[in-house]
Regions:
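Active-site-adjacent "lid/gating" segments in soluble enzymes
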Residues: 1-124, 128, 136
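Aromatic-enriched alpha-helical interface/lid elements that frame and gate functional surfaces
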Residues: 112-190
Length: 192
């Protein structure tokens, strides 16, 4: 187990998950929402260690399985950096389908999968991946049942252009009720 892998310019470099897993893999920059006074996201220290340790455990088990089947041993390795890149593969895949770079300002994020501040100062976030199935119910719950019929928002491309407006509408709705009430409402709609 190394910070950056057994080969390459950083092969002998030391590292902790804050830098090797989070920062160099792109999380701290890509996960920040840019504002005039923003900075790279602060990461949960040790979380990258846990993921990397789990990956190392899986490689050891795979090598043991291979030995039990073939009689041959194997060399296993992983690194904090490689685990960070592997963990970011979902973001990388999504970014490939987006014009330009990944969302960095709040108005570029998906309103249906963003955190919102509630009346009690707590945050609520849902994650809608099946848009046609769940978004209309969310829109109704937020008080915007006709949102998808609005000519500004009636196609995915138009919604992307006007995400900032949708974010403002949603923020006002979420701010009107406490988080636990929103959790009950969203759970009742089978929205994660």
């Amino acid at each position: 187990l190394t910070a950056y892998g057994p080969e390459g310019p950083d092969a002998d470099a030391p590292g902790f998950d804050a830098v090797a897993f989070w920062a160099k893999a792109g999380y701290t920059a890509d996960m920040s929402v840019k504002t005039d006074n923003s900075y790279p996201a602060l990461t949960p220290l040790g979380a990258g260690d846990t993921v990397t340790g789990t990956m190392l455990y899986a490689t050891i088990l795979t090598a043991l399985l291979r030995r039990s089947v073939t009689g041959e041993g194997d060399f296993v390795t992983t690194s904090l950096y490689n685990a960070g890149i592997w963990s970011a593969c979902g973001m990388i895949a999504v970014a490939r389908n987006m014009p330009g770079i990944a969302p960095v300002r709040r108005e570029e994020c998906s309103p249906e999968s963003s955190p919102f501040l509630c009346a009690d100062g707590e945050w609520v976030m849902c994650c809608i991946l099946e848009y046609d199935r769940y978004a209309p119910a969310l829109h109704r719950a937020l008080g915007y049942p006709d949102l998808l019929h609005d000519p500004r928002f009636d196609t995915p491309e138009k919604r992307m252009l006007h995400n900032g407006e949708i974010m403002d509408l949603f923020a006002a709705s979420f701010a009107a009720k406490p988080a636990d009430e929103w959790v009950r409402i969203l759970s009742g709609l089978d929205i994660v």
